[in-house]
């Protein structure tokens, strides 16, 4: 999404560069493979929207009914909203770019998609990192004074941290508008032929790109890896302690801890894959229509959907609500026929 094709500039027409587009790059994929990729992407978008919509609806209903929501529920609401918006945006973009390329290539439309994509991705990364951070502070068993003080204040800090992440993501997305531009060269000669071939060249602001990835991707990634790893170590130590005291594996507290670490472990794998795919995709390492670029899109679309499904499976409250919803959907046709 960061790369767009423009014709070579002349000194007289530098001001017109932003509105003169090259023809789309020739696709390296067969029509069947393109159709398959589009079908997979659309399926992932729909699954992600449904799963995150369910999580958001459950916690939003709790928020309205009780006039309050738990700290983890608040984080999940922010995370679900950002993912629903991101999945909807990506689905809308792929639809418009496939059906109306001229409209999609207009400056206002293109940059609206570009800024929104970066903003929502960074929000999702930060919210997920804060979810891992919250689990670490509430579940990990450390006795350091600073850690205990942080645990005592975490409930009041989370709302400020969430809104700070929104501000950072928005500011950063506006800063990164002109990091990378792709130009096309129509005069590259083909040997043993009188024809020319269209090539695509990237112009990248290296300093801006480094700042872009360090603040937007690497920082929340490092925070997530550290908190998840420390949480795993803490729970392992707790497991060994319970085993030595012969408490048993059916301790409710232990089961809750193991359920949380299981969810975090799966989330860690998905988070790393998504961050790497996002890094590659935004770096324009591959051609827009290449298989690798499309693979990155598939991974980025699969991440919100798969993690939301894991959250529903591993969270007792969400799992019960999902079963009740399935039961109602199963009984609804029978009630309608009666």
From Swiss-Prot:
Cytoplasmic topological segments: 52-74, 138-156, 227-262, 313-338
Keywords assigned by UniProt, alphabetized: G-protein coupled receptor, Glycoprotein, Membrane, Receptor, Sensory transduction, Taste, Transducer, Transmembrane, Transmembrane helix
Subcellular location: Membrane
GO process terms (BP): detection of chemical stimulus involved in sensory perception of bitter taste
Tissues in which the UniProt entry reports expression: Expressed in subsets of taste receptor cells of the tongue and exclusively in gustducin-positive cells.
Record InterPro entries: TAS2R
A molecular function GO annotation: bitter taste receptor activity
GO terms for cellular component: membrane; plasma membrane
Function recorded in the entry: Receptor that may play a role in the perception of bitterness and is gustducin-linked. May play a role in sensing the chemical composition of the gastrointestinal content. The activity of this receptor may stimulate alpha gustducin, mediate PLC-beta-2 activation and lead to the gating of TRPM5.
Protein name, per record: Taste receptor type 2 member 39
Organism in which the protein naturally occurs: Homo sapiens
């Amino acid at each position: 999404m960061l790369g767009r094709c423009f014709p070579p500039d002349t000194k007289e027409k530098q001001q017109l560069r932003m509105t003169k587009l090259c023809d789309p790059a020739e696709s390296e994929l067969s029509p069947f493979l393109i159709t398959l990729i589009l079908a997979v992407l659309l399926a992932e978008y729909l699954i992600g929207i449904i799963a995150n919509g369910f999580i958001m609806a459950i916690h939003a209903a709790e928020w309205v009914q009780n006039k309050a929501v738990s700290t983890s529920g608040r984080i999940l609401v922010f995370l679900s909203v950002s993912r629903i918006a991101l999945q909807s945006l990506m689905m809308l973009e792929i639809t418009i770019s496939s059906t109306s390329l001229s409209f999609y290539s207009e400056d206002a439309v293109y940059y609206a998609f570009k800024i929104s994509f970066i903003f929502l991705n960074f929000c999702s990364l930060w919210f997920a990192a804060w979810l891992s951070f919250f689990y670490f502070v509430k579940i990990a068993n450390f006795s350091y004074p600073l850690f205990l003080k942080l645990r005592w204040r975490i409930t009041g800090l989370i709302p400020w941290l969430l809104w700070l992440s929104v501000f950072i993501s928005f500011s950063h997305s506006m800063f990164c508008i002109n990091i990378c531009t792709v130009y096309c060269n129509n005069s590259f000669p083909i040997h043993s032929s009188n024809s020319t071939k269209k090539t695509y060249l990237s112009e990248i602001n290296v300093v801006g790109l480094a700042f872009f990835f360090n603040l937007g991707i690497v920082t929340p990634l490092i925070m997530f890896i550290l908190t998840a790893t420390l949480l795993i170590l803490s729970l392992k130590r707790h497991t060994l302690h319970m085993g030595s005291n012969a408490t048993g594996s059916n301790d409710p507290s232990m089961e809750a801890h193991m359920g949380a670490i299981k969810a975090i472990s799966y989330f860690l794998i998905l988070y790393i894959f998504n961050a790497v795919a996002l890094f590659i995709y935004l770096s324009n390492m591959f051609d827009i229509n290449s298989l690798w670029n499309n693979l990155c899109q598939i991974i980025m679309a699969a991440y919100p959907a798969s993690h939301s499904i894991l959250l529903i499976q591993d969270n007792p409250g969400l799992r019960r609500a999902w079963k009740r919803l399935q039961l109602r959907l199963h009984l609804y046709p029978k009630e309608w026929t009666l």
